[in-house]
Every structure is written in structure tokens, then in C-alpha cells.
């Protein structure tokens, strides 16, 4: 088995990709936070300390933690990778030929550590020391961005997702996140950890526009035994699901995809904000959203390059069938109706399973954590008063790269 392999949601987690929030959060303000998909600004130092506690908890569970900034710095050390990233990030069409040329020259001479920080964290015109004869910079305000910050890179789950023996490099729905994918494309192509390794690129690694075929990793659950559960949320489309499923089937990496149509609003922007897999037969569910009658489809390969699409009237039964289980154990969000709604908003259902029956979640979700504990699930709590304001929990903030089967 390749070490670049994710066989489940609940098998032993061995290696994971995180991104510590730093420079990007310093560029997040009340006037731009909504455009950058945040509801509020975060206290930068406190958010970093909370993220350090998350990484430390993972390491205490014998999980190897890779950090996106470090991987990007090491990738930029490869001349071909650096040139490719500069060409994709700083195009003539985006900046005009004169300004693009000046920017590429400036960034090409920059040390890799500084360049990685700017690619992830952004650069304002007031922070740009070079002059250009181009019209564009003369028409911009000092606090406008030359390079937009990517604060949502904190949520490494979404930009790429490893499914069995390969990876999907996801075409993101929102413009504020679309540039993130190129960083992962470069890392998986040129970084020594990934270059030359035996894994499949399912989807998203082509130089093309994917139109409406969007997929985000928060909607993708690798539930094991060749099955994949995908939510069609406000960020993942049926076109994206079918394209990913076709590639999974063509490569022989999955035997079925279960697709659930979710409500299209922010409180359940991804499937993993309302449903996560905690043990072989156990799921956390927010019942106000995850009703049994949600429209569900089973996608399976026909064997001739096409797929069979069949309506399923109960997503829980579809999961039970895929996993060979008689009945799933469902743990709903804790507290009364008000408390459950509040805790779901604060990512009570968005936990990261590190091994069967052991999860990481925010300590603030006391009612739901107590319910998990009573059901036999061990919760390793982490602080999240700042991180949680970004609308993502432990699962959102992690991209498993190596995890055992169930």
C-alpha cells in the first residue's frame, strides 16, 4: 500500500496536513472579512496558539503533522515549481503585461520563505516596494491587495482531499478560495514528499476552467470499504460529484458514491458541519438538517465507462448497505433546541476522528461533548474561541494524507 493513502474516516490517522493561521489573518478586517468568507475578524495571536494546541494534540496521538507553509517553502526551492506558481498566480490577464512582468521579476528574486508568506497571506499595494509604469497600480488604493490573502487556507480539508489511493485537487466554488488549489497542485507535483510517489490525481489538476463542476473536501467523507459519501452543499455541485465519481470508478478506487442533497446555506456549508464519522458504526449528526428524507443517490460503475445513478430514499440505509452494517449508531447534537443550534454553529459536529471512537473537538461544545462521552466516544478537547469564529472545526482544519482502512 502507498503511504499516500486514506482508507476511511475512522481508521488510525497517521499523517495530516494543517495550516497555522498567521499573515492572512492580519489582513482580515471588518471591511473585507465577508468578502473573504469570514463572519468576523480573529485575534491573530490567540488563533495561532489554539492551532498550536490542535497540532500538539495530534502529535500526542502519534499523528505526523505537516504544515502547509513549510511544504510551500520547500516546493518553491524547486525552480520549475517556483516558475509555475509565479506564472499561474501572476498572469498578464490579471495584472496587465507590464505590471505582471514587474511583479514576477520582484517575486522571483525574493527568498522562498518570504514568498510563501505572501502567497498564503497576501500583499497590499502599500506593502509593495517596487514601482511600475503600468496604469493598474496607479489606480489602486494603498490598502487594496496586489495578492489577495487566503485566510481560508486554514481549512486544509477543502482544497484537496485524499480518497483511497489518490487525491482530488478540488475546483473551489468561491472566488476567495480558488487560488488555494494551485498551491496544493504545486506541492503534490514537486515537493519531495509527493513527487514520484504512486498515487492517482482524480480530478482538478488540469489547466482549465471547471465551470460548474465544483467539489470541496468538507463535503467528501471516505467512509471505507470502497464507498464515498459526498454532500451536495452550497460549495459542491452534482456536476462536481459526477466528475469525481467517474474518475474514482475509472481508477478502480471506489465501488460506490452516495450523494446527499443538502440545504444551501452557510450553517451547513459542507456535509462535515452537520455530519461526521466517529467510529466504524457511529456518526455525529445535526438532526435539524440531516433528515432521513433528504434526496439521496447511489452512483455505481456500469463497467463500460459509464455510471448507474439510482435514487435512494434514506441516506442512513444507503450507508448501512455500503458498510455492511445492520444499523448505524447516530449521536445527535447535544442540549435543547437552542443549545444544539448554537453548538452546531460552533462546529460541535465537525470533529476529527484520530482512531476508532476517539475524536478531537472544541472544548466549548459542552452539551454535545457530554453526549459523545456518554455514547462511548472519547473527545480530546482543544480551545476554539478564536478558531471557531472562522466557521470550521477540527475536521475542517485538517487534510488526512495517510489513514488506515477499517
From Swiss-Prot:
The active site is at 396 (amidino-cysteine intermediate). It comes from the Bacteria. One of its GO terms (biological process) is arginine catabolic process to ornithine. It is an enzyme of class 3 (hydrolase). Its EC number is 3.5.3.6. It catalyses: L-arginine + H2O = L-citrulline + NH4(+). Its main location: cytoplasm. One of its GO terms (cellular component) is cytoplasm. GO terms for molecular function: arginine deiminase activity. Keywords: Arginine metabolism, Cytoplasm, Hydrolase. Pathway: Amino-acid degradation; L-arginine degradation via ADI pathway; carbamoyl phosphate from L-arginine: step 1/2. Belongs to the arginine deiminase family. This is Arginine deiminase. It comes from Vibrio campbellii (strain ATCC BAA-1116). The gene is arcA.
